Amino acid sequence: MTIIRLVLRAAASAALVLVALAASAAEYPEPKQAEFTARDFRFHTGEVMPELRLHYMTIGERTAPAVLILHGTTGSGKSMLTTSFAGELFGPGQPLDARKHFIILPDSLGAGNSSKPSDGMRTKFPRYNYDDMVAAQYRLVTEALGLRRLRLVLGNSMGGMQTWLWGVQHPQAMDALVPMAAQPTEMSGRNWMMRRMLIDAIRNDPDWKDGNYTSQPRSLKVANVFFGIATNGGSQAYQKVAPTRELADKLLDERLAAPFPADANDFLYQWDASRDYNAAPGLERIEARLLAINSADDERNPPELGVMERELKRVKNARMYLIPASEETRGHGTTAMAKFWKRELEEFLQAAPGG
């Protein structure tokens, strides 16, 4: 009986620990959802949309220092509310404690519940770029929320590139910038070639029908899985989970069999939006303190090219934190796990103006 009681007590203790861990990852206020209509929105092409819908979420009180968080390609504001990201950042005592910050999570133009081709315009939707996406975000922040200055702009992957653009295009709008898994330079090398192949694979699929399909092209899922494996995940991590051909086939088959509820036109527009990205010419205009966070095994932004070291010299108050590669990191996806960099963020914010 004593042994049984000890086992039950241990099990109960373990359950309490699991409950505590789950609670600590979710101890921030419930996100509030809202929509903003940007009227007469002008795209870089000169096209004007009478009403552009921007969906967003906020956490915390508007009177607190504001933090703008920008998601990656094919993501949304909701995609940033994972245990590995929000659960490491927004809770009590964490770097972006939602009791002390006003956190803004927009769905970028073309993504989530914001205006996008699949709403009905299909390929007649303006061919937007990152500049348009940042312009929409700026109108959301200043017009819908009435904010003139942000404590922090932090973005991951596509959101990281947009963070660079925020610093260049709106240099007085924030105290601090944290672009992650992103470089300020134009698309080039393998990063662009893989994106081009992804886009062309769908556009050249007869099932796409120039964007007028009635069911999603078969190439959509294959192209997404191909691009994901080629440019994300980390070599060490893949080798760990797929050390044999049999296990590699199993992993690939599982990914190809998994549901992919995306729209081909939305998908194409989102990836194509990076085509003319280039924040590099304006780096000297950045006034905010900047912490660039990349991973040593990032397939899209390989550190061995030396791009970041060269470009950061042009930014007044900038430094980089490079996450060491390991079996735990996930290549380009590493920065989605805040455990690898949250202490760096905390120290950075303490040293930044207003910290």
Q: What is the role of each PLM region?
A:
Residues 286, 292-294:
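Short beta-strand/loop motif that positions the catalytic acidic residue
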Residues 318-355:
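Catalytic active-site module of serine/aspartate enzymes centered on a nucleophile-bearing elbow/loop
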Residues 150-188:
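Conserved hydrolase catalytic core segment
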Residues 57-119, 307:
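N-terminal cap/lid subdomain of alpha/beta-hydrolase-fold enzymes
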Residues 131-151:
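Conserved acidic catalytic loop of the alpha/beta-hydrolase fold
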Residues 266-282:
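Active-site nucleophile elbow and catalytic-triad environment of alpha/beta-hydrolase enzymes
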Residues 173-257:
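Alpha/beta-hydrolase-fold enzymes
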Residues 299-306:
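Conserved alpha/beta-hydrolase "acid-adjacent" motif
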